[in-house]
């Protein structure tokens, strides 16, 4: 059997691995690269028509976003995923295709004036529909034979509704080898969904490492913090605008807001309106409601047993059409607006920012990771003005973050997951982490007695009776990056701050061996500065 690592190696998006075993070829995930890209993904080394199938760990676009392109290029195999993942991919791949078509149309309108050659979308809605027809839903904890000598099982990994680790049994020459692909390992105690299931045996493991170098810290009081933000904003007469990822995070926030209203934690504002202004989020919320209750955690199942919808609350309103979206800003009552995209790079959220950023009574609340170079990152780094739809907008609203919300396990969560295997796997392949994070986490596992490595894109490993042997090293072709257009002054200022911090570290190193009295005074001055600015 052979593993070829094609994407999300020494980076966190574009997950794709080719498994060739028992006479079959299967991709595990086929994701789109998003945000900052470090290394070029490698092309799939076989024609799409020669691939027998795909196993999708979950619905996020960085794990499934190239499935329509695969279908466009004559892939006709089955795509296996859990039933909730099949449902979520149905809406997310269509949405991704609409974005591809819109961006191509916009570039062509712009390019026509300059005589540029027309561009084609990466894929179309028709391609997405073709891919969606290839999906087959699989129940959790149910073994399925894909072909003689190839058996799979999906196990809940607690990252997103429908997310899974995938166990694969390969039988060749009378010997059975078990592989486990972790998928994205979930954080503990997330609302709605179950905690990750720990598997206990495998010969080889392919494991994510997103937060393999850090800890999340103590779990914040999300409901209390959110209630305080709502209270002070509504008391000022303002709106709370929340850029939110349509699938997963929006439903978590609805869960929190339902509890806030149920307990009366916001005083004096009755059943304040809560708008979901994202067609994708509205569809995702419907899928959450229609999903088998067994997919949810114990607390959510208890609510459902009492006839309580865990993501429904009085005052909840949905805006499907563009006209309905525009009408939200005509409503002067203090309200919550949940809209996509979560990093403010596209979608209806940009219109809500235009109408609310300049108002000091309003709050913009970020509830997820903001990648470098995005409008969301620019705002949380302290921009005083931004440009939206060609218009300069002064930032006068309160900018807040609800920290600690994460769908990914931290370092301790990852270690708990891998340490559940007994005996230890023969080798652990580290994927889905930033460049240095993968190296750090591989070393952490090595220090704990595992045999671990972090392959680069294009690496090939042959697994047989003699063990796992690397037959081709991955390539380290770095992607050239251009600075994003319209970057805010705040990004430049923040880089000055980062440079100053690096200089401080160099000065500290230069003082090694100095007099204790001087070093103590230096440390006191640094701590005083940190105390002043640590907010």
Where do the protein language model's features map onto the residues?
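A polyampholytic, Gly/Pro-enriched intrinsically disordered region
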Residues: 100-105, 292-305, 469-495
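Generic long, charged, amphipathic alpha-helical segments
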Residues: 387-418
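Short, compositionally biased "basic patch" segments
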Residues: 191-206, 293-300, 370-396
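Conserved acidic residues
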Residues: 52, 203, 335, 362, ...
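A general structural motif
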Residues: 185, 218-223, 314-324, 343-345, ...
